[in-house]
Amino acid sequence: GSRNMVDAVQWAQGLKGSETIAKDVEKGKKQFVGPELRGKTLGVIGLGAIGARVANAAVALGMEVLGYDPYISIDAAWSLSRSVQHCVTLGDMLPRCDYLTIHVPYLPTTRHTINAQTLSMCKDGVRVLNFARGELVDTEALLDAMNSGKVAQYFCDFPAEELLGVKGVYCTPHLGASTPESETNCAVMAAAELSDYLKNGNIAHSVNLPDVSQPRVGGRRICMIHKNIPNMIASITSAVRCNIENMGNRSKGDYAYTIIDTAEAPTEANLDELRAIEGMISVRTI
């Protein structure tokens, strides 16, 4: 990292066979001097399950932590340390960061989140970390920023031809999920999330649908997948014709998902009216 540990380890390996290793170490270590993390400012783009943990860990290391996530979930917000400062825009955050890390999914809207414009807002010598998806960073803009001194170092888990061999760029071979536990954990998580969807209608980590999760309230639950179009919620609440005790709705691209808890069971006529709404894809009761 900023302490040049990778270069230092490689240099130390080259001392094998020397009869004056201790003296060589004392003389050579000066070339690997780097700044401490304590007191530095970390910007975290994306405060989901991973981003929130990174932010909290950085707080524990004595860093000032800034967070940016316009779509942060309630659960993630509750899990954040109170020391994490919320930034409304990237423009509020980037000029203050010594380090910048990104933890968002790859979507058409997040492609090249780190680009020439965002990098121009950073302070000179910023260190950028990307262990989420390679496409989140515009590689050409990043290399230009490194050549100008705007970016001091770039760490990523996604080697690419244009990145390899560049001074200050450190690539690992996509090691993010390469652990003995990951395969089991992924299977357990998938089973738990599928069970939660079947039993409660909650959605987590879907590719095409938004995350929507809320505790059960009332006697019955109606779960609806529909197009993300205007006046849909008004049409749904009008057609339910039951006392609504709780409701959740989120969208993702062209699609949206709505959960409604009602005190009494909806009639088949109510459900048919919901299914007949323009843009409705599926209606399920639990």
Each model region followed by its residue ranges:
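Phosphate-binding beta-alpha-beta segment of Rossmann-like dinucleotide-binding domains, i.e.
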Residues: 1-41, 205
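Glycine-rich Rossmann-fold phosphate-binding loop(s) that bind the pyrophosphate
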Residues: 47-48
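NAD(P)-dependent dehydrogenase/reductase Rossmann-like domain
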Residues: 164-167, 175-286
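Short, flexible coil/linker segments at domain boundaries that flank nucleotide/cofactor-interacting
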Residues: 36-37, 123, 217
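N-terminal Rossmann-fold NAD(P) dinucleotide-binding loop
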Residues: 51-52
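Residues that mark the start of a beta-strand
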Residues: 40-43, 64, 221
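Aromatic pocket-lining residues of Rossmann-like dinucleotide-binding sites
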Residues: 57-58, 122
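Rossmann-like adenosine-cofactor binding region
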Residues: 66, 70-162, 178
